[in-house]
From Swiss-Prot:
Record GO terms (molecular function): ribonucleoprotein complex binding
UniProt protein name: Ribosome biogenesis protein ERB1
Acidic residues bias (residue ranges): 25-60, 69-87
Superkingdom of the source species: Eukaryota
Keyword annotations: Nucleus, Repeat, Ribosome biogenesis, rRNA processing, WD repeat
Subunit structure: Component of the NOP7 complex, composed of ERB1, NOP7 and YTM1. The complex is held together by ERB1, which interacts with NOP7 via its N-terminal domain and with YTM1 via a high-affinity interaction between the seven-bladed beta-propeller domains of the 2 proteins. The NOP7 complex associates with the 66S pre-ribosome.
Major place of residence: nucleus
Organism from which the protein derives: Kluyveromyces lactis (strain ATCC 8585 / CBS 2359 / DSM 70799 / NBRC 1267 / NRRL Y-1140 / WM37)
Any one Gene Ontology BP term: maturation of LSU-rRNA from tricistronic rRNA transcript (SSU-rRNA, 5.8S rRNA, LSU-rRNA)
Length: 791
């Protein structure tokens, strides 16, 4: 009975669906009538369906069986009252005979039919969509109507779903393997290689889709309604309008910077400075940095930093590579085969370098450095074993170390140019001297002559031949020195072992007579029984035992009258010493003068007295080779210069006062300041040394301006000037202010570098001397000339 009911219900449901479809079609076709009777139509349609169902019982047996199985699960949900005999008494035709359809007039929504369900509820039937011609789905092919059901559910069945009428949709036939191979070789037009999920058939492109794809590939316009070559509309003309469109004057705000915009800009600037607004570029960098930090995890990021120990010393940096270590060094750095052989034969510890420079055409051709491991190992040993000391660096401004010197313009006058050149000598001019009056210049040369020049005009006024240069090549004139007493006019000349005192006939009768008389007074000194004392002794150093020798010393010099030939040349007396006299210096009063004979041993320094014709040797022994000796300007002291030391002796007490240590290898000459508190010394090792006698025995200043041996230094007698001359042919002029305040150090300022003398046989300027009153400088050189340098 249950099966019967289920079959009846299934047939009734199918019958109801078919009748509903027919009813809707009839309503659409007869919509012009307001009310239509549908009883006869439904009966006819039902009878026809019953006949068709009877004929198709065998074909639809399986279909009914499947429907019955599907509805078996729903039998329990239906009430028995729904399947009572009373309900079965009424047919579908009888139920639908009472249904009335109402067509809404044209004033309402078009195509909408309002009706009622069997239970009386309102029902709206909308007409089927009548697509227009431009609709996308107007010409679409019929698709599968199985709904959104995956095809995998029908993999084991011969069909793939059901159509709207409930009939099966069979699976499309598949060709054989040969057909599939042919299809893969000869692809049909529009082939995509895809399967339609609704029908299971191959999905091909239509002609319209193929045409659209071709247009896209060829960069053509896909929409045919768009004209790419429309006529141009000239919105802006190239002709300038003469009259304005409007004559409204421009407002002032067009020409004045906007205050509101300035405020907004300042707000933005302030926000950027405070970090509230980050520029895009910086924001991008921060993001990149964050990403990089996130990828590169710092293993020791959370580790605590341990401060270094106070005594920790960092490893010194490696020295930068030199030209020899280049892969393409200059040719002069490459070793010759002989040098390479010598390098290979040397012990590794004795080699200057531990590699041989090589030259490569390109950096990519440079091989690996074989000594890198060994060098790193040795450096590690040095850092591990070699002691290191922390050296504190002094943060001193270099400019603060340079003293503030006044401008040279404020220190004038000083010589700056050559005014006069005295030409006439045929040999090197070794010495020169200025008359105390400042009018006459005396020069001595290797040609054996002494010449006297008028300073202002440069005219030679006197010449005397002291030596015959052709016969005596060993001796030459070393010193020419005027007597400081301007009333005598005596000129002292040293040549070899002899000292000549002469009075040139250029001063007048009174001065010449006074000078000759002063020289001749000494011959009558012992006429009245006077005894010449020759036992003057000055201790040479503090190590002497102080014992005095009362024995009479041998005569160290002879005072002889000149010969007739010498007297004819205005020579008044000749003093003969044991060795060649190289230096001579007068005492300020003009009665004493000191001479230096470097080769004479303990008699190297002799003091001569003009009024008594007396010569004394102050030292019983000599320490080293004596180079120069001078009297103190106003104290009874004698300054003796040896090769490395300068000693100051007190002649009245006959003791050594001070010993100066210039620090030079070989001193050449000295000169003392007119005030007597400072001394300068020159050396053959290109240095000029300034000593302050009130300070230490070491130099106060060391001047290294010359490039060759310094031959002469000289103080000006009146002005704060001094100079130095050397074999490089240059004369350096300095300003030297000595203060009365003993707490102030002397101020030394370089003023001028005078160049003019030529270098002959590695000899330049041999002697210099200042004018007694003016800021004039005289120089004598190996180029056989003497020069006057003036302001």
């Amino acid at each position: 009975m249950a099966r019967k009911n289920s079959s009846l219900n299934g047939s009734e449901s199918a019958e109801l669906v078919v009748k509903k479809r027919v009813l809707e079609e009839s309503e659409l076709s007869d919509s012009e009538d307001e009310r239509i009777e549908v009883d006869g139509l439904i009966d006819e349609e039902a009878s026809e369906n019953e006949a068709e169902e009877a004929e198709d019982d065998d074909s639809d047996a399986e279909f009914n069986r499947l429907l019955a199985e599907e509805e078996n699960g729903q039998e329990e949900e239906y009430n028995t009252s729904d399947f009572s005999e009373e309900g079965d008494a009424f047919s579908i035709t009888d139920k639908l005979s009472n249904v009335k359809l109402t067509v809404i007039p044209e004033t309402s929504d078009e195509g909408i039919v309002r009706t009622k369900y069997s239970d009386g509820r309102p029902r709206i039937l909308k007409s089927e969509i009548n697509p227009v011609y431009d609709s996308d789905d107007s010409d679409a092919e019929a698709k599968n109507t199985i709904g959104n059901i995956p095809l995998s559910a029908y993999d084991e069945m011969p069909h793939i779903g059901y159509d709207i009428n409930g009939k099966r949709i069979m699976r499309p036939a598949k060709g054989s393997a040969l057909d599939q191979l042919l299809e893969s070789i000869e692809l049909p037009e529009g082939w995509t290689g895809l399967l339609d999920k609704d029908s299971g058939a191959s999905l091909n492109l239509t002609e319209e889709e193929l045409e659209l794809i071709n247009k896209l590939q060829n960069n053509q316009q896909t929409d045919e309604s768009v004209n790419p070559y429309e006529p141009l509309i000239d919105w802006f003309t190239r002709h300038e309008s003469v009259m304005p469109v409007t004559a409204v004057p421009e407002p002032k705000r067009r020409f004045v910077p906007s205050k509101h915009e300035a405020k907004r800009v300042m707000k933005i600037v302030k926000a950027i400075r405070e970090g509230r607004i980050i520029p895009p570029k910086k924001l991008k960098e921060l993001r990149e940095k964050e990403e990089q930090d996130s990828h590169n995890y710092d293993l020791w990021g959370d580790a605590e930093e341990i401060s270094e120990h106070v005594m920790n010393l960092r490893a010194p940096k490696l020295p930068p590579p030199t030209n020899e270590e280049s892969y393409n060094p200059p040719e002069e750095y490459l070793l010759t085969p002989e040098e390479i052989d010598a390098w290979e034969k040397m012990e590794p510890s004795e080699r200057e370098r531990n590699f041989v420079p090589h030259k490569f055409a390109a950096l990519r051709k440079v091989p690996g450095y074989s000594e890198s491991v060994r060098e790193r190992f040795e450096r590690s040993l040095d850092l591990y074993l070699a002691p290191r000391v922390r050296k504190n660096k002094l943060n001193i401004d270099p400019e603060s170390l340079i003293p503030e010197l006044p401008s040279t313009k404020d220190l004038r006058p000083f010589p700056i140019r050559c005014s006069t050149v005295y030409v006439g000598h045929k040999g090197k001019i070794r010495t020169m001297s200025i008359d105390p009056t400042g009018l006459w210049l005396a020069t001595g040369s290797d040609d054996g002559t002494v010449r006297v020049w008028e300073i202002l005009t440069g005219r030679e006024v006197y010449q005397v031949t002291i030596l015959n240069a052709e016969e005596n090549n060993d001796d030459h004139i070393d010193v020419v020195e005027w007597n400081p007493d301007s009333t005598t006019g005596i000129l002292a000349v040293t040549a070899g072992e002899n000292i000549f005192l002469l009075v040139p006939p250029i001063f007048g009768f009174e001065i010449e007579n006074t000078g000759k008389s002063k020289i001749e007074y000494g011959f009558g000194f012992d006429t009245f029984g006077n005894v010449k004392k020759s036992n003057l002794n000055v201790n040479s150093d503090d190590e002497d035992d102080g014992a005095e020798s009362h024995a009479v010393k041998k005569q160290v010099a002879q005072w002889n009258k000149p010969t007739e030939r010498q007297a004819a040349n205005d020579i008044c007396i000749v003093i003969t010493c044991r060795k060649s006299v190289k230096k001579l210096s007068w005492h300020r009063k003009g009665d004493y003068f000191v001479t230096v004979q470097p080769d004479s041993g303990n008699t190297s320094v002799l003091i001569h007295q003009l009024s008594k014709h007396l010569t004394q040797s102050p030292f019983k022994k000599s320490k080293g080779i004596i180079m120069d000796a001078k009297f103190h300007p106003f104290k009874p002291q004698l300054l003796v210069c040896s090769q490395r030391y300068v000693r100051i002796y007190d002649l009245s007490q006959q003791v050594l006062i001070k010993k100066l240590l210039p620090g030079a290898r070989w001193l050449s000459t000295i000169d003392i300041h007119p005030r007597g508190d400072n001394l300068i010394a020159s050396s053959f090792d290109k240095r000029v040394l300034w000593h302050d006698l009130d300070l230490a025995s070491t130099p106060y200043k060391t001047l290294r301006y010359h490039e060759k041996a310094v031959r002469s230094v000289s103080f000006h007698k009146k002005l704060p000037l001094f100079c130095s001359a050397a074999d490089d042919g240059n004369i350096h002029v300095f300003h030297a202010t000595v203060y009365d305040d003993l707490m102030k150090n002397p101020m030394i300022v370089p003023l001028k570098k005078l160049t003019g003398h030529k270098i002959v046989n590695s000899l330049g300027v041999l002697d210099t001397i200042w004018h007694p009153r003016e800021a004039w400088l005289f120089s004598a050189g190996a180029d056989k000339t003497a020069r006057l340098w003036t302001t």
